[in-house]
């Protein structure tokens, strides 16, 4: 008897394009959300677009967050309850969106994602990443009811944020390899459809990296669509597996041990070079990944990340301890092997 079932939660509306920030109110109205929202943002996005957003919601209050933490989630929950908010609208990059996602889940209300930078696929996924001390927690939550991404605003975001978003997507290539490996060796649940969507999205950016240029709104359009596809793949899978493998463990370990960690997307991009070599050896696709990252202006070396070689090696040899997720790292890569991989690929 077949008894398998799945529950796929996806955004109901996705609106991408030039000037669509002014359509947030309309998009929310189409969702039939009653009442008044609480707007969640951080200082820079608020200065950039907060007034345009507030103009679409009479009487909506705003909470501004400075740091990502579980305490900040609690503050948003308290502010929403005090204001009688019936849903949340998050404006900004990863921080406000991740925090609003968790707060909405705790409140049992919906939320709308309004990204101002194409920095990572959390703008559409059902996962939040929240630091606590030297640990970063990946927390499951419902995805946004709607995503409204204004490519004009995103094209004017710091270019490093866009290249980080590109690198985050490109790293899906190795994340899917880890997922398939875990299915074969550990019998983890696997979705061929989610894996194919994630892999196709990564390959699309690798193949078109030369066309992604600073200042081009078309580049923000391409990257935004890729981030949406990656987030949808995670929703279909019901986990972050399609977009998070050993390269993410490597990045999370860098967050813990590096004196000045780089952007998340940049770290997973470099991690993807290393883990692709571990998967496929010197004739694998690590050069294609490296060349794509170079084409968009993302880091490909420890020096370009601003992290010393020793810390990169330590992160690679200890990344498997971050969480109980089987990847190509297995029970750990020894120091000699890590140095060989990082040296051969030019990371150090």
Which residues does each PLM region occupy?
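ATP/NTP phosphate-donor binding region
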Residues: 1-87
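Solvent-exposed alpha-helices and their adjacent loops that cap or buttress functional pockets
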Residues: 6-8, 31-32, 81-83, 104, ...
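A short, small-residue-rich loop immediately preceding and capping a beta-strand
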Residues: 82-103, 107-118
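A glycine/threonine-rich phosphate-anchoring loop and its flanking beta-alpha core
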Residues: 106-201
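C-terminal charged capping/lid subdomain of soluble metabolic enzymes
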Residues: 169, 281-348
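Active-site segments that bind and position negatively charged phosphate/pyrophosphate groups
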Residues: 192-295, 300-303
């Amino acid at each position: 008897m077949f008894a398998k079932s799945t529950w796929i939660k996806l955004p109901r509306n996705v609106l991408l394009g030039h000037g669509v920030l002014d359509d947030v109110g309309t998009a929310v109205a189409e969702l039939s959300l009653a009442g008044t929202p609480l707007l969640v943002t951080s200082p820079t996005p608020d200065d950039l677009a907060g007034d345009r957003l507030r103009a679409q919601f009479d009487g909506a209050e705003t909470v501004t967050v400075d740091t990502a933490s579980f305490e900040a989630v609690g503050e948003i929950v308290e502010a929403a309850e005090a204001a009688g908010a019936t849903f949340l609208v998050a404006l900004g990059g990863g921080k406000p969106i991740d925090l609003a996602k968790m707060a909405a889940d705790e409140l049992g209300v919906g939320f709308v994602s309004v990204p101002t930078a194409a920095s990572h696929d959390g703008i559409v996924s059902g996962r939040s990443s929240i630091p606590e001390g030297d640990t970063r927690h990946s927390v499951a939550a419902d995805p946004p009811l709607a995503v409204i991404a204004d490519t004009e605003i995103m094209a004017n975001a710091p270019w490093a944020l866009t290249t980080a978003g590109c690198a985050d997507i490109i790293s899906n290539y190795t994340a899917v390899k880890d997922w398939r490996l875990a299915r074969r060796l550990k019998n983890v649940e696997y979705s061929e459809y989610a894996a194919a969507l994630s892999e196709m999205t990564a390959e699309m950016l690798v193949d078109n990296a030369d066309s992604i240029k600073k200042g081009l709104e078309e580049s923000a359009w391409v990257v935004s669509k890729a981030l949406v596809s990656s987030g949808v793949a995670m929703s279909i899978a019901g986990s972050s597996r399609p977009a998070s493998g050993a390269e993410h463990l490597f990045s999370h370990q860098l967050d813990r041990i590096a004196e000045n960690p780089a952007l998340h997307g940049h770290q997973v991009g470099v991690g993807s070079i290393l883990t692709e070599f571990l998967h496929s050896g010197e004739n694998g696709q690590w050069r294609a990944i490296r060349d794509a990252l170079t084409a968009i202006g993302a880091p490909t070396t420890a020096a370009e990340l601003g992290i010393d070689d020793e810390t990169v090696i330590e992160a690679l040899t200890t990344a498997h301890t971050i969480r109980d997720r089987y990847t190509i790292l297995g029970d750990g890569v020894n120091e000699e092997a890590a140095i060989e991989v990082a040296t051969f690929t030019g990371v150090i």
